[in-house]
Amino acid sequence: MSLNSEEDEAELVQLQPRYNGEDTSATTNRELNGWYAYPIAAEVFAVVAVGAFLPVILEQLARENGYFFSDSTKSCVDHGGSRRMRAEDGLKGSEQCMIKILNSTISTSSFAMYTFSAAVIVQAVTLVCFSSFADHGPYRKKMLMAFAYTGSVASALFIFISPTVYFLAPILVIVGVTSLGCSFVLLNAFLPLLVANHANNTGAKFATADSSSDFELEALNPNTQCGQSHARSAHMSSRGVGYGYMAAVFVQVISILILWLFSKTAIQKRHPSLPIRVILLLVGMWWAALTTPTLLWLRPRPGPPLPSQEAKTLSAPTSRFRTFLFYTRFSLRSFWRTLLRAISLRQTLMFLISWFLLSDAVATISGTAVLFARTELHMGTIAIALLSITSIGSGIIGAFAWPRVQKRFSLQPKTILLCCVAGMEMIPLYGLLGFIPLFKKLGFIGLQQPWEIYPVAVLHGIVMGGVSSYARSVYAPLIPEGSEAAFFALYAVTDKGSSAFGPALVGWLVDHAGSIRPAFIFLAVLVVLPAPLLWMLDVEKGREDAKAMADGEGRGRGTYERVREE
């Protein structure tokens, strides 16, 4: 990072402002470091907390208040001592633990699944209502900081959630997951601005007479500049993700050390949930502390005003509450208009439906795998943390490997997604092998032994690397030019909102079956559902339809097309 970043900034040519209040100052290394700092801060919560320990802590807190599925008189945890009662009095090791919530009896695994379904619904609604804050007005950075610190506090507060107040844990999970999703949407809203004001885009260093010809050539060949911007955007985005994953692996290793240290003491035997609560406190502190560089270095970069606000004058100020309501109404109207436009584009709609199903399947398998390892395979928290690291490491390998596979065999991005669906389908099918009598007699194959889940985690990570890398690549050509922000907002809501249904249905199945394993039947069906839609998807036809819509509407107005709608 340059110590003279402010001087460097002064030397860079600024773009002409497109609206009143736009910050067109050139992007500096200091600002880029501020943007990169946030994935390092927040990705730790996404991977370590959401991906590993939140499902475990929810199940553990509920278990300490629960009773066995086949005998409601026996507690799942012997409160008179430290001994677990899973196998006592002839009870099977796979016995599910049940708990009463609001006059309903659910399993402790379902308690975690239902909580995440509720969190996803709240997150999706919040994303829809707050989308205009990401694109318009001076609130982008303020909202980013608000969500970041709210989420970090929610994670840290788990240190106070003992089994006696376990019903407060879902509230903190919902707040944390919602804050995480909304903060990343707000962070991503900075990306096109940082790219647009990058030194190489603004004619870096000094504007001289000799450089005018370059600007003229660039104007005659806008696709070259567009391609450079897309490449730079992809590079910055991938670096942010890479930094975030490295930070997550680092904190996960620290978490394993914490769990190991607690396992050597008598504290864990008396308070089984305490080590995980300490880890969540650490994650919250990490999130808050590493957000500080973003707070200090990332410029606010105000967005364009909303259309109706352009006519307002300073002589007619509005209250904060009325401004909030105005932004929310605009967000809902904008989302509804974008949804109607997407419905009129057959190929775009087909992809969004397939992505809805695929995203739901991916999220459901991830959550179910952790709880299956916890309740059916009886794996400890250290083993689950190692499982998370295995999946993350494989995901990084997959992200690098799939492009090589695509280049080697000249595959289309859609084909890569179909390969990922096929790989994901192998996971529930392998779990179903545990129902076959021959394999049941062997005692392994079909996820009957803890070690079997690690190769499954490798497969899951590799497949996830492909899904994460190629879903946007397939979707991008299907968007009308000039509507990128609106359609990617729809993509984000489809991604986040879909994950509410699969976990809830798995929870319902577990409640009625008394075991997670039968849910593999549902997962096998859920994973394969998007495959026919992806197979029928005609990307070239979708590209032509999107271009025709943009030409018919006279668009091509860039990132801020929603500013001038209506």
Swiss-Prot record:
GO terms for cellular component: vacuolar membrane. InterPro entries: Atg22 (IPR044738), Atg22-like (IPR024671), ATG22/LtaA_families (IPR050495), MFS_trans_sf (IPR036259). GO terms for biological process: amino acid transmembrane export from vacuole; autophagy. Glycans are attached at N103, N200. It holds the Pfam family ATG22. The chain crosses the membrane at residues 38-58, 110-130, 146-168, 179-199, 242-262, 278-298, 351-371, 382-402, 416-436, 451-471, 488-510, 519-539. SUPFAM superfamilies: MFS general substrate transporter (SSF103473). Residues 547-566 are annotated as: Disordered. It is found in: Vacuole membrane. Keywords: Amino-acid transport, Autophagy, Glycoprotein, Membrane, Transmembrane, Transmembrane helix, Transport, Vacuole. It is a multi-pass membrane protein. Vacuolar effluxer which mediate the efflux of amino acids resulting from autophagic degradation. The release of autophagic amino acids allows the maintenance of protein synthesis and viability during nitrogen starvation. Belongs to the ATG22 family. This is Autophagy-related protein 22-1. It comes from Phaeosphaeria nodorum (strain SN15 / ATCC MYA-4574 / FGSC 10173).
